[in-house]
């Protein structure tokens, strides 16, 4: 027993005294390297090995300079060898898992509706959109989207009813007075509407407008105060010449107050047929304001634009007649 221990100590001391021949760490690296080399030859793919030199150098730095106890050396060597073997086994397991994943990727996907015979070739060549007996169900078994929508949203028969909305021309110029669908209007409104549509007869339209009782009711509808009427005695006519001034000239007039304006509606209109809303009817609205001191009036031309439907609403739906 004592002789065996002395021989073991001498062998350990010999290894410690002769570092050139080979240290226990170098031998461990050689053995672990041989084992990893065998595993790499058995495997098909390349295996990435960890840096054994760095691990061994860190282990060499951690060991003391003096020779340790043989029990401590054997225990440290066992832990180091077990660590190397576990890392090699984990690398081998990861490599086999990658090979298994590649093998499963190569296999084609199967659907329940696709038969097993020749399904892999059909799916790989044309994908899931290949039509045929092996690639998918027949076209007769697949209902079209149109049929699905017709079954889901069934058509309901609706009675087509015409709109009970008459145009303004049809509303005013209808020859058949006895029609029940068209409401009866007063003759004065018809005459006034025809005169307004005729732009050549300005004097006649002015007379009709002055004689019509619709003027009192139409002024508030058009946004004009009914109390601000033209002064009596024929002064309500539009003054030609010097009284018609441009808006920039009105700024130079002293004592101009807009709140003293007198309203006069000139029954002159112009229509445009190229508008999106149809023909637009423009009324020339003149505001007459008195100048302080001389009793003269300044006429301010303004415009109000109406579509035929809005004009019809203004005339007949606001109790103008």
From Swiss-Prot:
Residue ranges for the region (Disordered) are 1-80
Q: Which residues form a coiled coil?
A: none
GO BP term (any one): intracellular transport
Q: Which GO terms describe its cellular component?
A: trans-Golgi network membrane
Pfam families named in the record: Clathrin_bdg
Q: Which GO terms describe its molecular function?
A: clathrin binding
- Kindly give the InterPro entries that the UniProt entry links to this protein: Aftin-like, Clathrin-bd
- Name of the protein this chain belongs to: Uncharacterized protein CLBA1
Q: Which organism is it from?
A: Mus musculus
């Amino acid at each position: 027993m004592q002789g065996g221990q002395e021989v073991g100590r001498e062998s350990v001391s010999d290894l410690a005294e002769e570092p050139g021949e080979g240290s226990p760490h170098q031998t461990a690296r050689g053995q672990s390297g041989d084992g990893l080399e065998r595993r790499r030859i058995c495997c098909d793919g390349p295996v990435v090995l960890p840096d054994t030199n760095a691990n061994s150098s860190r282990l060499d730095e951690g060991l003391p300079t003096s020779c340790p106890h043989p029990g401590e050396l054997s225990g440290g060597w066992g832990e180091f060898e077990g660590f190397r073997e576990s890392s090699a086994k984990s690398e081998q397991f990861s490599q086999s898992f990658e090979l298994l994943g590649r093998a499963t990727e190569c296999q084609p996907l199967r659907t329940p509706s696709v038969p097993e015979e020749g399904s892999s070739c059909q799916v790989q060549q044309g994908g899931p959109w290949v039509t045929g007996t092996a690639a998918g169900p027949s076209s007769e078994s697949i209902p079209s989207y149109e049929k699905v929508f017709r079954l889901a949203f069934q058509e309901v028969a609706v009675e087509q009813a015409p709109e009970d909305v008459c145009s303004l021309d049809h509303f005013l110029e209808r020859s058949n007075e006895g029609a029940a669908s068209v409401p009866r209007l007063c003759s004065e409104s018809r005459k006034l509407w025809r005169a307004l549509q005729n732009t050549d007869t300005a004097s006649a339209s002015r007379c009709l407008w002055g004689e019509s009782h619709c003027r009192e009711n139409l002024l508030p509808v058009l946004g004009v105060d009914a109390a601000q009427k033209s002064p009596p005695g024929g002064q309500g006519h539009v003054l030609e010449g010097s009284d018609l001034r441009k808006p920039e000239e009105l700024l130079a007039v002293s004592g101009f107050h807009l709140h003293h304006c007198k309203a006069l509606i000139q029954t002159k209109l112009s229509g445009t047929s190229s508008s999106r809303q149809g023909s637009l009817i423009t009324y020339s609205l003149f505001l007459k304001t008195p100048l302080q001191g001389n009793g003269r009036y300044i006429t301010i031309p303004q415009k109000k634009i109406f579509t035929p439907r809005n004009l019809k609403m203004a005339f007949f739906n606001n109790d103008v007649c």
